[in-house]
Regions:
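Compositionally biased terminal segments of proteins
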Residues: 1-176
Length: 176
């Protein structure tokens, strides 16, 4: 089992109610891995520092910023308000339980949340987000609920841009 999935299981056991986004969300939804050094997840409400400390989730100052780690040394980013502008309540309400081994599930953001959040992130920076978008188009295109995805976008223009680019990526894949 992939080490990030093992860590996702441990985080879920430690903290409960977490929804994985980012590289781990993509891995859970598509079974495609890419290099990632951290685990990003959403929770319905702020996790008190005391709880995290009690569970031995520790912080380090890196370049003047507090960075949180699991007891096993994995860097984590915890989202409590939104994921790339998508409200946390929608991220959690649309999350999917993914079975990672017999009778063990971990929650991942829905494909629709991952698509919208990756498109928004890719607009701000170059890199892994483009790869993640291609992976989602290749592996999950046919299962996308376009009506749900539309409710996650901020405008008709954003929805059409995402839809058109996903359509094009899917068609390109069919040619190879």
């Amino acid at each position: 089992m992939h080490p990030l999935i093992q860590e996702a299981i441990r985080i879920t056991q430690d903290l409960g109610g977490v929804v994985f986004i980012g590289a781990v969300g993509i891995l859970l939804q598509t079974k495609v891995t890419r290099e990632s050094q951290d685990l990003d997840f959403a929770v319905a409400k702020e996790l008190p520092a005391e709880l995290l400390d009690e569970k031995q989730y520790f912080t380090r100052k890196i370049k003047g910023k507090e960075v949180r780690y699991t007891p096993r040394g994995y860097k984590i980013d915890i989202y409590t308000k939104d994921v790339s502008g998508i409200p946390i309540d929608k991220v959690i309400a649309t999350a999917k339980d993914i079975e990672v081994k017999r009778e063990v599930t971990v929650k991942a953001a829905s494909v629709e949340v991952l698509v919208v959040s990756k498109f928004r992130a890719a607009a701000k920076r170059k890199g892994a987000d483009d790869t993640d978008i291609r992976t989602l188009a290749q592996r999950k295109y046919k299962g996308i609920d376009w009506d749900l995805l539309k409710t996650l976008t901020m405008s008709e223009i954003e929805f059409l841009r995402i839809r058109n680019q996903m359509d094009a990526l899917h068609r390109m894949q069919l040619r190879f």
